[in-house]
A protein has these predicted regions:
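Compact, glycine-rich, soluble single-domain proteins
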Residues: 1-73
Length: 73
């Protein structure tokens, strides 16, 4: 399952990050690491981006970036 598939209020654990380069490095710095719990906390009015809570912070990710984060319930 991909992160972008989470509904608001749904929580999952990060299983894999398929993002490389500067964006992948930044996501890792923000806490998108294997085993971390992540919750979808909001969606913008047009559906992109989504807001996620991870490591005590709320991060907004575009759907194209969230699609590269694999999660499991």
């Amino acid at each position: 399952m991909r992160l972008r598939e989470l509904s608001v209020g749904e929580t999952a654990r990060v299983t894999e990050l398929r993002q490389w380069g500067a964006m992948g490095r930044r996501l890792r710095e923000l806490g998108f690491l294997e085993g971390e719990s992540v919750t979808c906390v909001g969606v913008s009015p047009l559906g992109d981006p989504h807001a996620y809570r991870i490591c005590g912070a709320v991060i907004a990710l575009r759907n194209c970036d969230a699609a590269r984060v694999e999660v499991a319930p």
